[in-house]
Amino acid sequence: MAKQLLLLLLLFIVHGVESAPPPHSCDPSNPTTKLYQFCRTDLPIGKRARDLVSRLTIDEKISQLVNTAPGIPRLGVPAYEWWSEALHGVAYAGPGIRFNGTVKAATSFPQVILTAASFDSYEWFRIAQVIGKEARGVYNAGQANGMTFWAPNINIFRDPRWGRGQETPGEDPMMTGTYAVAYVRGLQGDSFDGRKTLSNHLQASACCKHFTAYDLDRWKGITRYVFNAQVSLADLAETYQPPFKKCIEEGRASGIMCAYNRVNGIPSCADPNLLTRTARGQWAFRGYITSDCDAVSIIYDAQGYAKSPEDAVADVLKAGMDVNCGSYLQKHTKSALQQKKVSETDIDRALLNLFSVRIRLGLFNGDPTKLPYGNISPNEVCSPAHQALALDAARNGIVLLKNNLKLLPFSKRSVSSLAVIGPNAHVVKTLLGNYAGPPCKTVTPLDALRSYVKNAVYHQGCDSVACSNAAIDQAVAIAKNADHVVLIMGLDQTQEKEDFDRVDLSLPGKQQELITSVANAAKKPVVLVLICGGPVDISFAANNNKIGSIIWAGYPGEAGGIAISEIIFGDHNPGGRLPVTWYPQSFVNIQMTDMRMRSATGYPGRTYKFYKGPKVYEFGHGLSYSAYSYRFKTLAETNLYLNQSKAQTNSDSVRYTLVSEMGKEGCDVAKTKVTVEVENQGEMAGKHPVLMFARHERGGEDGKRAEKQLVGFKSIVLSNGEKAEMEFEIGLCEHLSRANEFGVMVLEEGKYFLTVGDSELPLIVNV
């Protein structure tokens, strides 16, 4: 009996812990909270935040300027953790989330670079919706000390060697900005079209990072902590800044993270032009700005930009930064104040932004579980619907790079034996990429393939992904006896990750030798599956007829193994398209520190927009088991007249107007619509992304103008033989403009060409 009572008591204690409400302020059962204006939900958020800040002592104020903000018991304000991560699912990284209670896992979606390959912005939105909902579910379970998530990463994947390129949506600024908007709206609880569903209340807070021109971590001894990105005004305006502008203006993100690196000599977190004049002034940002972790300390310690710790504090607070990931502001703000390098007003400004976001999250409105989003149960985390979306995301992102003689899909009836070879075939962790959380469940590619061919034989092939040692003879012996061979190779987080950039684009170690040897020995052409984030030079495989099919699977998340096997055996028709250019190994001769996008003498440029060199695979490349055709049907206006009285002529004798001169009203009407007919001419139904590009008649001539630029993309599901019409809206200011050498966006007169696949349509712009 005593044991039974003890068990009941333990169950009660556990249940009590799990049922405890998450940390919050302004408990209505506390009579003192009625005296505080910051607890009154009928008052404007700004007024509530000002009231709270006014009640703090200077020491309390300073304590709140770091990511791990302590509680203020006398006011009933609990501790708060600003740092949580949710790049492609609620993650381990950051101290804000714990998976040690009711919730022990979260849906782990594909790494962003693969999700982007679907070119489906509504799917991106749905993924972020799920992440936001699961984040709130974890918080409601009492397993989170904050609801601010430092995602998405919307830096441009400028160089294929970048270890964090896997975290981004790719190399195109327009696409990256579109991803940012979809992610922010989904996570924060808005609708897909941007309507706020619950006034000013946030489901969770998104933070677009890393502001700005951050795309080098650690390359040949040069680190992000000291790197000074020399960026032209044109590249800043046309490539690096647009995703952040879109994130703020259209996504209405509640957070921004300033980067480690300097841009043209100035640390990002200490740049008032960047943080205050641009983000808050020009783009009307209303949220908080955090530093990357220890990005304040390096301004003095590593970069030597500031002459003292107090100067570093002054630099960032006066620039417009609000919270420091790290302890630097907690240690040095008091002395900076005493030395009159900062004022209490500078501190108050930061705190108003910080507490405003916490109020918007509902953390000063009483028990959050009784408020909007309070009904999101921990049981919704890892729900069947969420896991199904993770599988869909992997299916839709995977790219079929090569499929000679229609080797794929395999017939489920005719494959009697299968050899599965490679270091990435049976490792769960590799599927997840970085910034991942504990997945709901996982199936490796090997296990998924064995659901189709029970007696599939497996050999790792290499001692690890680094493949310094390869068991080539054993792998060859297995391949010789199999009906078909699938090689699952690529990279993992030992080869590309945060704080680690690659120095070449080849597959690691003896992987190429293993692949070639197995392909030569196999009875039939083999299938090569690449699990990796960044591009690799697989020219040897692309040009080898004994390697019949190549699949790029990114880091496909918890359901990636299933998605890969479904594509190989024809239960899903692949439709993903590359969101980055795949360069040859010779690209490593270009200095990674060279930030120029445009080509120049002896320099081929970067990304599909400006690159003039050889490619392994182009941006947007992706095959299917079906064939699709495109035909332009209608264009609302083939000649557009802007009638700009202030038109000018440039050195190329091309008339142009400034986009700023046209203004919002002018740009709103300078649009046209175009309809494209898409037909599935194959035998399988499929989901197909349609990409529309535009180019100026003089595009790419002198390096000033892009070769072409993406102006729209949509995804459509078509049955075999089915046709459908898709409408695209082309905004001249947004889609056809370019930056001049002064970083000013201009719209040039002349003939433009809209292209979808091999179809092309002229559009004439008259300034």
UniProtKB/Swiss-Prot annotation:
Gene Ontology BP annotations: xylan catabolic process
Top-rank EC class of the record's enzyme: hydrolase
Glycan attachment sites: 100, 643
Keyword line: Extracellular matrix, Glycoprotein, Glycosidase, Hydrolase, Secreted, Signal
Active site: 292
Residues in the signal sequence: 1-19
Molecular function, one GO term: xylan 1,4-beta-xylosidase activity
Coiled coil: none
Transmembrane regions: none
Subcellular location(s) of the protein: Secreted, Extracellular space, Extracellular matrix
Any Gene Ontology CC annotation: mitochondrion
EC number: 3.2.1.-
Family in the record: Belongs to the glycosyl hydrolase 3 family.
Protein name per its UniProtKB record: Probable beta-D-xylosidase 7
Organism placement in taxonomy: Eukaryota, Viridiplantae, Streptophyta, Embryophyta, Tracheophyta
Gene this protein is translated from: BXL7
